[in-house]
């Protein structure tokens, strides 16, 4: 009887350990691809998404042109991000990957931000970048590296990270992300540009500054 109880407890413990892993894992694909359909008119419902009828899929559904061309840099931080994700390359649906091109002006940066659903791996195509990420609480450890052309750096999923052009000429980088739609939370505009605005007194206490400093920042980032 005691042996049976021990066996039951062992099995229960094993189930408790493996169940969270099972729940956290994405389901395996049941088809070669699932090109996202803009409407359900010519689609089939697979794995929670409307997918284009495979018989209507063409090579263009897996194609995105133009990453060889830089977009104008008009942002105050001096960078432009061109994203290729499931929103503009429908064939990425269910494939768990996306791509971005980042152009940096001289002294430009891709400011501190995080991707809530993806790990990022970045390669420098042109120029020199200072990159880094910060670990979670309580250590908040900073890892930084200077990257030159051809160098690669990885940013773990969910951690705050950044890139800054420290060269004397414009820079270009490409990055792959482990999600078809990784999302992005840029820290400064998210905190100070929230809509509706976060109470300045809350942010003043969090950042240990005068509320007038917070209100000035909120004015700058107001959408």
Swiss-Prot record:
The keyword Ligase does not apply. PROSITE patterns: GERMIN. Keywords: Apoplast, Disulfide bond, Glycoprotein, Manganese, Metal-binding, Secreted, Signal. Glycans are attached at residue 38. It comes from the Eukaryota. Gene3D superfamilies: Jelly Rolls. Residues 65-215 form the Cupin type-1 domain. Mn(2+) binds at residues 113, 115, 120, 161. It is found in: Secreted, Extracellular space, Apoplast. SUPFAM superfamilies: RmlC-like cupins. Pfam families: Cupin_1. Belongs to the germin family. May play a role in plant defense. Probably has no oxalate oxidase activity even if the active site is conserved. This is Germin-like protein subfamily 1 member 10. It comes from Arabidopsis thaliana (Mouse-ear cress).
